[in-house]
A protein has these predicted regions:
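A contiguous pocket-lining binding segment that forms or flanks enzyme active sites
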Residues: 156
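Signal-transducing coiled-coil/dimerization helices and immediately adjacent hinge/linker segments
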Residues: 173-185
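Regulatory input/activation interfaces that engage signals or partners
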Residues: 5, 12-24, 28, 32-138, ...
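Basic, alpha-helical nucleic-acid-binding regions used in initiation and control of genome expression
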Residues: 2-5, 184-185
């Protein structure tokens, strides 16, 4: 996929993003938002996580096949989330709206306990998140992984994700402010 410099790609983004905007406050918001991202950059196993400061994380939405659910979600919630560089970043005054795992882990991911005890078994080779800060210090992350057969994000793909980060982060925040979402989370 190309950067959003070509008019047809930009047009697709506008159309897909409009679908997500129309779905704000409904159950179809996260699927529509992920569809918009996928229209720009290939992503695998998208997951939306709510991080509370004093509670374990909660998966709000995912597109993980059944065979990978245990390694992607269940094992994560058993405790490795505390070592997750994304979780730690999210709970410590994050400044950016997008992060890439290799950059957050400062190139030391494969030497970490988190990698040995959890991440190495997930079957993913790269990951990036869109981060949205909510009131009260809570955070929602849209996690986007890459499987080995698709390779890590290229610099151009990550640059494209970077361009998408502001509107996506803001939309997630606005979605969280809708009554139906707030009442159930």
């Amino acid at each position: 996929m190309h950067l959003m410099t070509d008019i047809s790609q930009f047009s697709k983004w506008n159309k897909d993003l409009s679908g997500a905007i129309a779905a704000l406050g409904t159950e179809s918001f996260f699927p529509k938002l992920i569809e918009a991202v996928r229209g720009q950059v290939r992503i695998d196993y998208p997951q939306v996580w709510l991080y509370h400061r004093d509670l374990p994380p909660r998966v709000l939405y995912h597109e993980i096949p059944q065979h990978a659910l245990e390694s992607q979600v269940d094992q994560y919630l058993e405790g490795p989330y505390r070592e997750d560089p994304f979780y730690q970043t999210s709970m410590n005054q994050p400044r950016a709206k997008i992060y890439r795992l290799s950059r957050v882990a400062l190139g030391e991911l494969k030497d970490s306990t988190y990698y040995r005890d959890y991440y190495g078994d997930t079957g993913t080779c790269d990951e990036a998140i869109f981060l949205s800060k909510l009131d009260g210090g809570n955070v929602i992350n849209l996690s986007m992984m890459r499987l080995p057969e698709h390779g890590p994000f290229t610099d151009a793909e990550y640059e494209n994700l970077y361009l998408l980060a502001e509107p996506i982060s803001e939309l997630i925040k606005r979605h969280s402010e809708h009554q139906e979402f707030a009442a159930s989370n």
